[in-house]
Amino acid sequence: MAAGTQFDFGNARLASMSKQPRIGIFVCHCGINIGGVVKVPEVVERVRALPGVVAARDYQYCCSDPGQNIIRETIEKEGLSRVVVACCSPTLHEKTFRKACAAAGINPYMCEVANIREQCSWVTKDRDQATDKAFDIIAMTVARVANSEPLVAAGVPVTKRALVIGAGLAGIQAALDIANAGYETVLVEKEPSIGGHVARLASVFPNFDKAQEMLDAKLREVCGLRRVKLLTGSEVVEVSGQIGNFKVRIRRKPTQAQGSVPDSPDDGGQETEELVGAIVMATGHELMPVSRLRQYGGGQVPDVIDALQFERLLAGNGTVRRPSDGRVPKRVVFVQCAGSRDKEHGVPYCSKVCCMYAAKQAMLYKRRVPDGDAVVCYIDVRTPGKGSEEFYRQATQEGVRYVRGKVSKIFRSGDRCTVWSADTLAGCKVVLEADLVVLAMAMVPNPAGVSLARQLKLQLDANGFLTEAHPKLRPVETLTGGFFLAGTCQGPKDILETTVQASAASAKVLAILGQDELLREPTVACVDEDVCVGCGNCELTCAYSAVTIDPQRRKAVVNVALCEGCGACAVACPSGAMSHKNFSKRSVYEMVDQI
């Protein structure tokens, strides 16, 4: 659940529930954003007649310091017990106004925002219609706040340890950042070794740095840090708890010498339990198997390989040799978007890094085989990022040929491969004879990572990548509190972007671990046990595992530490037992009555 806001209650009247609520309304002009469309003075006069309203004022910018002072002074002067501020979206300034109310002695959750900017003045051109609509929105908010109850955010202690799932480059970077800040980190990797795909690369663009040399420094550091608990050959089995306090069950796969047998048929390895406060998902990606592209000879023609296989051919210092017969290929054709941007045979998205690593591989091949011919068949060359366009131009200057057109078929012809393509710039069909074909296969989510994400009820997009809470404002957070994203588990990206995202995720983790306790928003689901019949609809609907059915009593139970307050359970409940604090059914009915 989202962390609560730190309010200084001061003399806040937590039990400000007098029989006759005293409601104050403050209407903001927001410059001309609201005042230029809505007749604010008219609205102020009309809202004074609403039940329970004892004060109504307008001000140019209520969010300013003078505006907040007016709110505080009016609360004290009129003895207000509830406040409605008619202004912009509550996302922007709800916390601002609630803090002002708390400072004046009102429970902050007795303050509500009526959005008359985004939902009224910005979308309604007619002044009379906008004025009537603004009044209706305020009237509904008054009906809601009249039924509100004083709430207090509860504090939850924080376990000052972190878990990183996946020990590729993203996971290693995140673990190092967290550990170097002074917190113990559990780094879990399902493979026997760490390093991920980067460990399999010959070099990286745009400077041709040796990938292994670059990675070795990270590996030595992470293996040498006492604050990093590295668990290879292990996988996360179960995660329970909530942000600040997760209990993680990890199974370590059994290791046997070749030819040995397990001690028992069900020997699944040793299980351990770790307590952590935050979790970084760095489960990475895989390349789509070449066997899925039968039209390209994938899985049928031995000299049709993917880019990672070609990296291994480039890894040594010797001559490049093709898999089928060990001969030096005199012509290598690189096929771009093999499975990417192809809804029929692969995935609809661009894999983002293929254009750059194909240019790198083509240049490395030309340097190893000076008399060789490197041809890149592409749909579009995409070169985002610093130095990328210059890198592509360097490839053309070093003799790499680019042919714009979609490859339609690849098949074996004698001891060579025949590539059918097109040159859309020249407007003709192209037939290329190649000794070796390298497919830039689509980057797809790691299947094990997808399975784990589904088990943890983390959100996935249509392609199976983990989904961020907001693509612009919360790019490394998930909708489940305490889980953060790093690397290609969230989508295709290069090494630079992966490292940056890993450090961003670790910074979010440190923001949690640096607190002694987390405040939980009290606006959560609640259940009326007298009405609940234990049908379980709420449990099935909850995306955060916050609602369960007590097996003995057959009643719904809400874990307030997990609840995000989304209200899905209240919608799904057929008996009406599930509700939401300060957004009860009674509040909703009375809000509707105001229209």
Sequence positions of predicted segments:
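Residues forming the flavin
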Residues: 1-595
